C-alpha cells in the first residue's frame, strides 16, 4: 500500500493552505462542500488524521467519520429537500479514488433527477457559499 501524501488537496485544506466551503468541524473531522458537486448540497467528510483511505485509517477515526457522515446526511436531506442520499467512498486508483486522503461523499437525491457526472463542472463560488451557509446553519441548529 502506498504512503500518505502530505501534498494532497485535503491535507492542504486541513492545514489552511487551501480554501474550502466548510460546513462542520470538530476535533477529529471536517466537512465541506464539493466544488464540483453532483447535486446541490454534495458534501465531503474527512478525518483530520493522516489516512490515505479506509484501508489504513485507525478504527476510531473511521467510526467518527461515519458518525459525522450520518449527521451531515440528515442535515443535507433537510436543507436541500432531498428524498434520499447517496453515500460514496472510494479506495485506491483502481477503486475510483482520486484524492488520496480518506473522504466520504454525501450526495442528496431526488427521485427521477439524474446526478451530474463526477468532476464535471465547477460550481459558482457564490452558489457554494450560499449552500455552505444554509447547511452550516442547519447543523448548528441540531
Segments (PLM) and residue ranges:
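HIT superfamily nucleotide-processing domains
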Residues: 1-142
Amino acid at each position: 500500500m502506498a504512503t500518505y501524501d502530505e501534498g494532497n488537496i485535503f491535507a492542504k485544506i486541513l492545514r489552511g493552505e487551501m480554501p474550502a466551503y466548510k460546513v462542520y468541524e470538530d476535533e477529529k473531522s471536517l466537512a465541506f462542500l464539493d466544488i464540483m458537486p453532483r447535486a446541490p448540497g454534495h458534501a465531503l467528510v474527512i478525518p483530520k488524521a493522516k489516512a490515505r483511505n479506509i484501508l489504513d485509517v485507525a478504527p476510531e477515526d473511521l467510526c467518527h467519520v461515519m458518525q459525522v457522515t450520518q449527521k451531515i446526511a440528515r442535515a443535507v436531506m433537510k436543507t436541500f429537500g432531498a428524498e434520499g442520499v447517496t453515500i460514496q467512498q472510494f479506495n485506491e486508483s483502481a477503486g475510483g479514488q482520486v484524492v488520496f486522503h480518506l473522504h466520504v461523499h454525501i450526495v442528496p437525491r431526488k427521485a427521477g433527477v439524474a446526478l451530474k457526472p463526477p468532476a464535471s463542472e465547477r460550481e459558482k463560488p457564490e452558489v457554494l457559499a450560499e449552500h455552505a451557509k444554509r447547511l452550516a446553519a442547519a447543523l448548528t441548529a441540531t
